[in-house]
Amino acid sequence: MKRSGYCGDIRESSIGKEIAVCGWVHSRRDHGGVIFIDLRDREGILQIVFQPENKEIFEAAEKLRSEYVIAVKGWVRNRPFGTLNTNMSTGNVELVAVELKILNTSPGLPFEISDYIDTSEELRLKYRYLDLRRPNLQKNFVMRHKISKEIRNFLNEEGFLEIETPFLTKSTPEGARDFLVPSRLHHGNFFALPQSPQLFKQILMSAGFDKYYQIVRCFRDEDLRADRQPEFTQVDVEMSFVDEEDVMVVIERMLARVFKMTLNLDIKMPFERMPYSEAMLRFGSDKPDTRFEVEIKDFSRELKNSGFSVFSSVISKGGIVRGLCIPKGASFSRSEIAGLTKFVGEYGAKGLVWMKITDTGADSNIVKYFKEYEIRVFISKLNAKSGDLIVFLADEEKTVAQGLGALRLKVGRESGLIDKNKFNFLWVVDFPLMEWDKEEQRWQALHHPFTLPKDADSLTKENAGRAKAKAYDVVLNGIELGGGSIRIHKSGIQKKIFNILDISDESAEKKFGFLLKALTYGAPPHGGAALGFDRLCALISGEDSIREVIAFPKTQKAVDPLSNAPAAVSDNHLKELGLQQIEN
């Protein structure tokens, strides 16, 4: 029996036609001596009717159970009056079976094949082949395909070349740990799986390819946070003879195309450009969610001579004081406010100062330490109203920004202030080139060490903390979709950066010598970007977790319950690789 169409594609236009469909038994019902089967395939569900008049296939249909794989031939007809199902795209029609073939059977299921299941993620991933049959996940992967197709179409039309870069490459650990692959032919030596194609795409620009792209798998052996994967996919782009605006415009147009073709949304361009310092001040984050108007305000200047010693002493030591208004937060109980204090404590804050705004001013056990005009300044700058709660943090700038930034998002989510129908894009620009690592007592590149400084000629180790990078991150609704930079294309500047980062000439040559040499042979000015493809797919599909748009994801412990990877290998295999296992 040859399939002539998909279950989910059958409509009134097929009425009176004989068709054949294949799929999985989604459900079975017996009504008044008639058997009804909901047959499911990739495109949807079609109701199949087995009538007792056709004794042979009726008896066969009685044996059908959930997830049996069958092929059915029959005639399409209108559903009888009163039995239409407006929740299904095929809800006006049904197939009256005249032939049935059972292609495979299935035992009892560990969970129901439904979009609404109450089961552990571990179990879902163990039986991922069943989990992936759920209609919502099927839709997610159809959407993922559409997104990759539109990205490729756009970049191809713009003159980009899709070029693959190596998966077996050299370990250059500057950031997350590499996944290492031992060499069988060269004992004691290892390949590394790439964290990104960064160095190779720069070399492709040096080779004269002008515009490159790749939708590429990347690997990072890092401690997994809430929604990270050890292997992930990114959209990788690089261009020659460009500046920051050139790259950002291409990425904007690509994203606008994707959102139009997938969600039929018209994305406003150009995206807002927001300096890093402004993002950290107003939103406490370098990936600000601008869908709601609650903003952080700085009061360090107004409070440097404050009678409240907690504030004035912090400011005198070089710290800052910033505040946030929580709409209608005056109704919070002391225990709820204590919960907020505990929350910001997770970001290093030592305490949370608060005031409840009333019709007559402010109410708190610390109000007495402030002059009346200071209270008015708080209320005015924070645009606070009666019934609101204003909170303050006093500490070093990074702690205050992170604490209030996280609290702002918590308030936005829990108070229903975020408009989930909005898609607010923006670029964060003017990043610091480097940040000081207190533990290692050295400068670290904020993005990566191949980013071009805004004023490379005047950069020294002494002024590195003030240097700005030609870097840019694209943010959507508080999520960093990706980022990029203009790269260093002269070996002398690259060596200077390595020197400031305390990477010795010997170490730089050992790790990056092939790049440094390529830069000496007439490398053009170039720049690019990389976008998190999994994250983009999750956002467009309306999913909170990227695991819902990755076919075979790992758990938070970096384990695949389906295949039980990672797994031990035999001693013989280790011996071939020149390795041996040692006891912990």
Swiss-Prot record:
UniProt xrefs under Pfam families: GAD (PF02938), tRNA-synt_2 (PF00152), tRNA_anti-codon (PF01336)
GO biological process, one term: aspartyl-tRNA aminoacylation
Region Aspartate, residue ranges: 198-201
Reactions performed catalytically: tRNA(Asx) + L-aspartate + ATP = L-aspartyl-tRNA(Asx) + AMP + diphosphate
Cellular component, GO, one term: cytoplasm
Lineage top rank: taxon: Bacteria
EC number(s) given by UniProt: 6.1.1.23
Protein name: Aspartate--tRNA(Asp/Asn) ligase
Assembly description: Homodimer.
Gene Ontology MF annotations: aspartate-tRNA ligase activity; aspartate-tRNA(Asn) ligase activity; ATP binding; nucleic acid binding
